[in-house]
Amino acid sequence: MKRQALIGLFVLAASTSFAQFFRPAPLNEAENYELKMGKVTMRIDAANGARITSLKHDTTEVISQTPQPNMYGSTFWTSPQKEWNWPPVREHDIMRYDVEQKDSVITMTSQLSAKIPLRIRKQFAVDKKNECIVVTYSIINEGEQERKVAPWEITRVPAEGTIFFDAPLSAITPAGLMNFVEKDGLSTFDIDQAEKQRKINADGKGWLGYRNKGLLLMKRFQDLTPEQPAPDEAEIQVYVHQGKVYVELEEQGAYTTLKPGEKLDWAVRWYLQPEKSKRKLY
């Protein structure tokens, strides 16, 4: 019997202790919103970059809750990174987003970047038919010149569990940096620890999976050809922070030219279910 999708949408008042539980010293006091679908709850903090700070199935959390200033939750950047270097653009990554709610859809819009003239819009909605949460990102060129840009979602999860995607081992670069193995036709990485930061690139098939604590998180997005990502970037990236801190599940969209006033839209579909669920996601 198909599960009934239930939508719950409301603002959560944030106490100081609540904010500290999710991260230390936020830029602003948290302004949290929630989407609910059956047993899945997604929480978004509009006051701090419109980040996804929590994703739970019942009471089991899949987003990393390890305290890391500014390096927490699921965020969004523009690609390639060389356009802004480091740190990430504050208006996109950590500053407050304006919020609009309509028909059980949450839309959050960034301030215009002082570094690059791009505005980010994030729309969060429940897809009842497919039992997932859809996050649609928009990049809007509000400058006076053409810009080439790609969308980039970064999701931080605990440094445990298994990451997998559909790509040959030979296509993962740099080779040998992480202990990926072939299992059931997929490239699979049981997260381990090392005293250095590691990051790999791969050309996948439009999805990225993560298993931990008996749950399966699946993110689905546009499948790219090897020529479509931004220069020196990739459709799928995995970053492992040194030690046992957090891991980033990253995916990018196509490198696109935006004329002044134009925008691009890019959707990521989030599925979360018990690993032993009968529904097949890959």
Give the predicted meaning of each segment.
Residues 1-21:
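Bacterial Sec-dependent N-terminal signal peptides
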Residues 21-23, 27, 81-130, 148-149, ...:
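Extended, loop-rich substrate-binding clefts of extracytoplasmic carbohydrate-active enzymes
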Residues 20-38:
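Short N-terminal segments immediately surrounding and downstream of signal-peptide cleavage
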Residues 40-42, 50-53, 61, 131, ...:
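A contiguous, surface-exposed recognition patch within enzymatic or periplasmic domains that forms
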Residues 272-282:
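Terminal connector regions
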Residues 32-93:
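Acidic-aromatic substrate-binding/catalytic surfaces of carbohydrate-active enzymes
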Residues 120, 133-135, 264:
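Hydrophobic core residues within well-ordered beta-strands of beta-rich domains
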